[in-house]
């Protein structure tokens, strides 16, 4: 173990450098040793090298741990004055070592202890903060143990490194728990649905308690099911057996009947952590018991002080005290009990470093154009606000699966929990199957060229179109696929030698409604279908054979990764019977998960047993609840808005060894709950996914520091969100965000407005603005080759428009939400008046076949029209075609030279590109197709543009905001 003086010396050295830059180590150690009697013998690079050489492995060695944190902090810094190398590169690390003046042998040891992590890391939007974490004086106990556990579970080194970086990014932005003056840091972590957010906040808790946070409150969803799931996960992977038992018998544990408890799968330390040099965790909630008033057991909330005269947050007390952990349901009564108990304890609340983790922090739906006040949510937020007021050292970290969290939509709802300090957007994890795997966002191939190999939609998505509610055909096919994929899993487990635990769970999710009465009817319908399916009969096998030959086999032939695929149905047939038996075991093939005890025909407890079942559910399966082994989803949710779609993406997740088997059966002509209007759920979901990815890309772009300062702060994120949801209004009009988006510079980047007007008057106005430009285009289309290797091309009419004329046209356009385009207009106006752009190429793509052509108004020429629909209220989904964007980027100079001569001849350095799409919505397509003439008020003139790559000003900054009330330094103000 390293001498305390050596640790103290290096801590002082790193604390001095943490806030600035790497400096000559020898000189820094000499300087710090002057104030530390006896430290002179440790103030040399030779001693440092020896200490590194004989340090404990990864899980130990405070010296190694401190230096690893600081080196990685320097690795990640964007644009530091002391290095021109890119972050997270060998070149950056070389610059660090040179600044420290280290010898080659020392560098080699540090590289072994803290290798350069060459992954992009999370996207961070943050205020400036005081560095403290790299040199904290706590005990590195639970985080190394957790990282080691993940490694044993089969996590790759890369995945653990990703988690390491992401959790450190969160914890370093919390307040130093030993800081004399209290400060509340509030942040938000944005993950993906079913992507492992729990692993992230478990890591954050581990790091935070190691650093000194002594009360951790996890708000684990609004349902018992979610709270219980979170409690067990934390107990199993963080708290550990010794902290759970606290000297009691194994058989007295609340997990005594849990198979994984008896199998030794809960983390173990060998003895109580406090005996081994760490510290204990006291649970204030258990597997099935939410927080309850402690009464005489109030002492459980009391913190022991070794030095009574000093505050708890003093290092002499803090690092000797045990941590308290509770997982609490987000319920006003439960939170009320906690608030009441905290008021009773003797330990001054102002002394306790607290971490509040809010899982699924955007619990209420936000994507609605007319939000209604939610009294329960308001009451819960009031209790959270009370906790934050009572606990001045409390840090609040919310977790959500969508960047459009409620906290950015409604300032009246977010005033006390707004993430004022940081927003961290996690990278999509490796092996994750998400939105991009079910959609063809950027597929260039035409419909005729799409195959199971190149089209995610063809491979994984199956249309559900029913004549009426009695039409069970699509549901039966989905259930047949569920049985087939079950047999495939058994086949792979045996043929590939994957073992019995490879496919511990195999599930199908049916979601049609949140209403319990609907579940009752659906349970009867599905039960009848199951028992009448005849899976052991010749007729049933003939049906399965046909589905195997036409669907499963051709997809798996091109999509299976390193796993076996039967050459014929005959090879799979022996596994059908065992698969059906597994699903129908205990005569209950179907589980309803909705809280109605009368309907619970089986328990969906994935922790305690292997589950091969069909699940029917609504709310309980829509937020946070992890459906393990999910392979087939049948989704027909009848709703007036698509707000729940992102959270309802239960079909996302990790699908090791069965990605090719995953199927989504989704309604394509679902009637809305109001009126006769229909909605294509797949396209609606696609629109939300596209918008979310665009927003994540924006956060990534704006997270890059400019001149050592952040381009945007968390307080400026709400106006970015409003760009994507311009029609949303707060529930309380007198509260507003204190920032307004003024300008978005987008040189070399494709931009695509979606908020086109709905009124015929405004549509007619816009169409007549564009008609002269259309009429001025060349008479014959040019054939643009966007993929020379495959010989793929498309025709387009081409013309050029002066910069000032195009700017005037943009300025005159009408919008359903002018605020969406205005920041882009400010930029376009800016590059035009500064003469940074000469002209624009106008492209009007044409169809290869002579169909879908119309004349507009009194035009002589015919133009191709495009089928496009509004997906989120008045907002359109995707408008442009990926192949058109490829050519636009080439011409505007964003992607180098093209191999296509027709493209290259149009390229100049100061030229932008506009791609124009005359769009016809569903109601007018018959007229357009039959008459070939359309009144301008029935056409939506959609477009996208790319400004020249070098058309920018104001340095490297790409976004500009204005403060609404400059006298207020808060994100939310009263208007």
Named regions from a protein language model:
Residues 638-659, 796-975:
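C-terminal accessory/interaction regions of large nucleic acid-associated machines
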Residues 309, 329-330, 464-501, 505-517, ...:
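C-terminal catalytic or substrate-handling cores of phosphate/nucleotide-
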Residues 245-267, 352-358, 362, 367-497, ...:
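Conserved P-loop NTPase catalytic core
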Residues 249, 253-305, 340-363, 371-373, ...:
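Conserved C-terminal RecA-like helicase domain
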Residues 5-141:
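N-terminal accessory nucleic-acid engagement/regulatory domains that precede
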Residues 590-673, 679-680:
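Conserved RecA-like P-loop NTPase helicase motor core
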Residues 116-181:
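Pre-P-loop entry segment of helicase/translocase ATPase cores
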Residues 183-201:
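Walker A/P-loop
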């Amino acid at each position: 173990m390293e001498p305390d003086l050596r640790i103290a010396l290096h801590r002082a050295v790193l604390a001095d450098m943490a806030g600035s830059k790497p400096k000559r180590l020898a000189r820094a150690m000499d300087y710090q040793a002057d104030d530390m009697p006896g430290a002179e013998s440790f103030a040399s690079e030779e001693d440092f090298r020896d200490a590194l050489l004989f340090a404990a492995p990864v899980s130990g060695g405070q010296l190694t741990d401190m230096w690893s944190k600081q080196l990685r902090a320097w690795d990640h810094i964007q644009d530091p004055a002391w290095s021109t190398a890119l972050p997270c590169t060998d070149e950056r690390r070389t610059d660090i070592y040179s600044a420290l003046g280290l010898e080659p042998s020392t560098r080699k040891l540090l590289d072994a202890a803290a290798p350069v992590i060459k992954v992009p890391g999370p996207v961070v939007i943050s205020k400036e903060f005081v560095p403290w974490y790299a040199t904290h004086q706590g005990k590195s106990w639970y985080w190394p143990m957790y990282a080691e556990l993940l490694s044993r579970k089969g996590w790759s080194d890369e995945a653990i490194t990703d988690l390491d970086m992401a959790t450190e990014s969160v914890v370093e932005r919390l307040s130093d728990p030993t800081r004399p003056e209290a400060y509340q840091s509030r942040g938000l972590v944005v993950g993906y649905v079913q992507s492992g957010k729990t692993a992230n906040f478990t890591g954050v808790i581990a790091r935070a308690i190691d650093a000194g946070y002594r009360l951790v409150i996890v708000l684990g969803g609004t349902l018992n099911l979610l709270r219980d799931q979170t409690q067990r996960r934390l107990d199993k992977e963080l708290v550990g057996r010794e902290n759970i038992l606290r000297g009691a018998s194994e058989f007295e544990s609340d997990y005594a009947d849990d198979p994984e408890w008896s199998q030794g799968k809960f983390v173990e330390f060998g003895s109580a952590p406090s005996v081994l040099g760490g510290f204990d965790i006291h649970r204030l909630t258990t597997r099935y018991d939410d927080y309850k008033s402690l009464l005489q057991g109030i002492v459980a909330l009391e913190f022991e002080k070794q030095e009574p005269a000093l505050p708890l947050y003093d290092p002499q007390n803090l690092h000797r005290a045990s941590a308290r952990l509770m997982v609490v349901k987000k319920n006003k009564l439960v939170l009320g009990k906690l608030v009441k108990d905290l008021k009773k304890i003797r330990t001054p609340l102002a002394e306790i470093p607290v971490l509040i983790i809010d899982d699924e922090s955007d619990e209420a739906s936000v994507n609605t154009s007319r939000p209604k006040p939610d009294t329960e949510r308001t009451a819960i937020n009031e209790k959270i606000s009370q906790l934050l007021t009572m606990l001045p050292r409390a840090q609040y970290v919310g977790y959500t699966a969508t960047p459009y969290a409620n906290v950015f939509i409604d300032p009246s709802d977010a005033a006390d929990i707004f993430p004022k300090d940081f927003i961290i957007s996690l990278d999509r994890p490796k092996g994750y199957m998400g939105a991009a795997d079910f959609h063809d966002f950027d597929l260039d191939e035409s419909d005729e060229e799409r195959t199971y190999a190149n089209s995610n939609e063809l491979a994984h998505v199956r249309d559900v179109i029913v004549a009426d509610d009695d039409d069970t055909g699509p549901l039966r096919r989905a259930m047949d696929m569920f049985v087939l994929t079950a047999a495939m899993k058994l086949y792979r487990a045996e043929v590939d030698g994957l073992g019995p635990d490879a496919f511990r769970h195999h599930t199908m999710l049916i979601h049609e409604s949140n209403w319990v009465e609907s579940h009752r009817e659906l349970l009867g319908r599905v039960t009848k279908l199951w028992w009448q399916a005849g899976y052991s009969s010749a007729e049933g096998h003939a049906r399965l054979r046909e589905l195997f030959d036409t669907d499963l086999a051709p997809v798996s032939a091109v999509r299976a990764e390193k796993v076996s695929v039967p050459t014929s149905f005959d090879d799979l047939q022996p596994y059908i019977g065992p698969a059906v038996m597994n699903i129908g075991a205990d005569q209950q093939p179907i589980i309803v998960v909705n809280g109605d005890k009368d309907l619970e025909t089986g328990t969906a407890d994935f922790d305690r047993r292997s589950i091969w079942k069909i699940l029917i559910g609504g709310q309980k399966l829509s937020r946070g609840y992890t459906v393990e082994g999910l392979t087939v989803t049948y989704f027909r949710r009848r709703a007036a808005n698509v707000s729940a779609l992102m959270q309802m993406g239960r079909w996302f997740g990790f699908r090791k060894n069965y990605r090719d088997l995953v199927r989504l059966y989704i309604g394509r002509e679902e009637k809305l709950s109001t009126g006769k209007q229909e909605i294509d759920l797949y396209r609606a979901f696609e629109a939300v996914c596209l918008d979310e990815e665009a927003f994540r890309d924006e956060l990534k772009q704006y997270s890059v520091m400019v001149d050592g300062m952040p381009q945007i702060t968390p307080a400026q994120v709400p106006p970015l969100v409003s760009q994507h949801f311009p029609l949303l209004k707060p529930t309380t009009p007198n509260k507003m965000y204190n920032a307004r988006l003024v300008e978005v510079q987008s040189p070399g980047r494709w931009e695509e407005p979606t908020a086109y007007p709905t009124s015929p008057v405004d549509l007619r106005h816009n169409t007549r603005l564009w008609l002269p430009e259309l009429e001025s285009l060349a008479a014959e289309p040019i054939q643009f080759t966007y993929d020379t290797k495959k010989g793929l091309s498309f025709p387009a009419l081409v013309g050029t428009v002066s910069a000032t004329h195009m700017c005037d046209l943009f300025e005159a356009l009408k919008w359903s939400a002018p605020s969406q385009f205005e920041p882009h207009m400010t930029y376009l106006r800016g590059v035009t008046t500064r003469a940074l752009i000469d002209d624009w190429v106008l492209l009007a793509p044409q169809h290869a076949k002579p169909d879908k052509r119309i004349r507009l108004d009194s035009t002589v020429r015919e133009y191709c029209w495009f089928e496009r629909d509004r997906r989120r209220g008045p907002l359109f989904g995707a408008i442009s075609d990926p192949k058109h964007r490829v050519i636009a980027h080439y011409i505007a100079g964003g992607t180098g030279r093209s191999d296509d001569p027709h493209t290259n001849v149009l390229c100049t350095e100061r030229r932008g590109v506009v791609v124009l799409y005359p769009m016809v919505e569903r109601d007018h397509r018959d007229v357009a197709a039959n008459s070939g003439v359309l009144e301008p008020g029935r056409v939506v003139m959609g477009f996208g543009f790319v400004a020249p790559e070098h058309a920018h000003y104001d340095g490297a900054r790409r976004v500009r905001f204005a403060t609404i009330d400059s006298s207020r330094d808060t994100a939310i103000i009263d208007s």
